[in-house]
Amino acid sequence: TDPSVVLNPLSELEKHQYEYIYFRTRNSWTMCGAFYGTQVILEELGYDKENLNAYREYVFGVFDGNLLLEASEKYTADEIKKDITDMERDPFYIYINGLNPNCEELTFENKEGQKQTLKRQMIQFNSSGNRAVIGTDYEHSIVEGRGKGQRKGNLLLIADTRGKMMISYLSEVFEKVYVSNIYEDADLIQNLDEILEKYNIEYIVWAQDVAETGNMSHMMALNPLLKEGGMSDVRTDP
């Protein structure tokens, strides 16, 4: 019933412009960028900002790029060695701590056109970049979190591929996060009442590239609302 608030993470990202917050070749942020974007949401919910280094140690352990060191010793040509040693030492691309307990139940359409559900670790060992978080072309996902924010309710995240990269951070605060793929989840609106009740949803976050907002081909999950003109209560944060 309350009006929505539009949050723009750009001002927070600009504070960290010298960190590796954007992929160099893709229109998306890195896990580091997604971390700072998430802080804007958590601050709106009344939480103090998290410490990135403390979170990295929880997710990735204390591993600090030994694979890069090994590669720089193996390739001795000066130019190649310089390129390797200059690579970003972001642990997200190097090692993922298998002790991280977070996992998700992913629902997607298989090759036969049937809906299939599988349980997997939230961050994948065999993928890198945003694919390590997104995985297959899913419809929706239920992420088990740590719930350290002690919220009474949970969170529904309606997100594109960029938005889902915030999931490991949001699941720190909530016990469960229901993630709807804005590109694929055509049944979201018709099942919304059931989802809100079943998963005790307290907050709904819609996270999408502003360039795609309002384009029905990029918003399958919300298209019924667009057609009905049901998104007029959004107010912009000052």
Residue positions per predicted region:
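Extracellular glycan-modifying ectodomains
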Residues: T1-P238
